[in-house]
A protein has these predicted regions:
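Catalytic-core segments of class I nucleotidyltransferases/pyrophosphorylases
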Residues: 219, 226, 232-239, 252-255, ...
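Bateman (tandem CBS) regulatory domains
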Residues: 1-4, 10-11, 16, 59-70, ...
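A short, polar/charged loop-to-alpha-helix boundary motif
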Residues: 46-62, 111-123, 280
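N-terminal nucleotide-binding beta1-loop-alpha1 segment
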Residues: 110-139, 144-145, 152
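Conserved N-terminal catalytic core of the sugar/cofactor nucleotidyltransferase
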Residues: 52, 150-223, 228, 233, ...
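The conserved cystathionine-beta-synthase
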Residues: 5-26, 32, 51, 72-93, ...
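A glycine-centered beta-loop-beta connector
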Residues: 19-23, 27-46, 64, 85-88, ...
Length: 353
């Protein structure tokens, strides 16, 4: 962090030297006054524009400092931080300073690696036997099968890390020791915690084993998905709708190869020639209010559709979020080959857009 800080009395030449020593594309300095308080930021572009206006290399940095700078504040709420990061991305800012209560630098967020900070707990469901993928899953749990040289679940952990989700649980049962071994060290900076099912608990029941806070929201997703879902947009949709649950959905279009009659009793009122209809399929990714998840019976088998239908019947607001982008449910040999072909030349889902 210190390599990005420069005193406002330092010269422009000092600033250029410091910027040249920075690696990667985060060519931004944070300018501090004699008391260590942050007064602004300075980029190589700011310096170039200043030199063109006649600023000299021996002039102080404070002459060119950008004082109306964007920053994260440690006292800000989670949603305020999220909105600041969105505005910074839209403005093309890569490095975002984090300022403490005294106005000093508390940290730096590189938006090229962490695009958001979602206030979510995440639970990845990884206890299934993957029987349709045998013999591949005889000795390897499906989430650890490799696609593009990486475990399937690793792509999902990477997506969580890019969105600043750090509180991550993985439910395990089949070949649980292998899953625990995989998560015995941090993955993408996340130290996930494994929760083992004593008996199969369905597609949602294992979430009842996680000690969730009474307030807040939790992302629940199948661990055998390959998807470029925008988790930030899904979260914002969930919050803006005031939903108790949001289901990620995949558009699924069905074509009928015949002319279809519209009828009223025995009377034909219309004819549609080979119509198509688009439906939305459950993508196996959800955001729940923790208050709703508190209704899960502890340690009992519960499937997500049944739980959601019960919530709808009780009058809870359940919405859907359509996925625009890649989504592959790796549940069959055909889908495994499809995903493998897709990732043959990509090491990261971010390359898919």
């Amino acid at each position: 962090m210190q390599k990005h800080i420069i005193p406002e009395e330092a010269t422009i030449l000092d600033a250029l030297d410091k910027i040249n020593r920075l690696s990667g594309g985060a060519m931004t300095l944070v300018v501090a006054d004699p008391e260590g308080k942050i007064t602004g930021t300075l980029t190589d572009g700011d310096i170039r524009r200043g030199l063109l206006r006649g600023t000299g290399l021996a002039d102080p940095v404070k002459d060119l400092v950008h004082r109306r700078f964007m920053a994260l504040h440690v006292s800000a709420s989670a949603d305020e931080r999220l909105q600041t990061m969105r505005r910074a991305r839209e403005a093309g800012i890569r490095l975002l300073p984090e300022i403490d209560a005294d106005g000093r630098l508390a940290g730096l967020v590189d938006l090229s690696t962490v695009r958001s900070q979602l206030p979510l707990t995440a639970v990845l469901m990884a206890g299934g036997r993957g029987e349709r993928l045998r013999p591949l899953t005889l000795n390897t749990p499906k989430p650890l099968l490799e696609i593009g040289g990486r475990a399937i679940i690793d792509y999902n952990i990477e997506n969580l890390a890019r969105n600043g989700v750090k509180d991550v649980y993985v439910t395990v049962k089949y070949l649980a020791d292998m899953m625990r071994g995989y998560f015995s060290r941090p993955r993408h900076g996340i130290m996930a915690r494994c929760i083992e099912e004593e008996s199969p608990l369905g597609t949602l029941g294992a979430v009842s084993l996680v000690n969730l806070p009474p307030q807040g929201h939790t992302l629940v997703m199948n661990s055998d998905l390959l998807t470029t879902i925008d988790l930030e947009e899904m979260y914002l949709h969930h919050i803006s709708e005031g939903a108790q649950a949001t289901i990620a959905a995949i558009p699924y279009t069905m074509s009928v190869p015949y002319a279809i009659l519209t009828t009223d009793g025995p009377r034909v009122t219309g004819i549609a020639e080979k119509p198509t209809a688009t439906h939305f399929a459950n993508a196996g990714i959800y955001i729940f209010a923790n208050s709703l998840l508190s209704r899960l019976p502890h340690g009992e088998r519960t499937d997500a559709p049944d739980f959601l239908l019960d919530a709808i019947g009780r009058g809870d607001k359940v919405t859907y979020y359509p996925i625009n982008g890649t989504w592959i449910d790796i549940g069959s040999p055909e889908e495994f080959r499809h995903a493998s072909d897709l990732m043959q030349h990509h090491r990261s889902l971010t390359k898919l857009g």
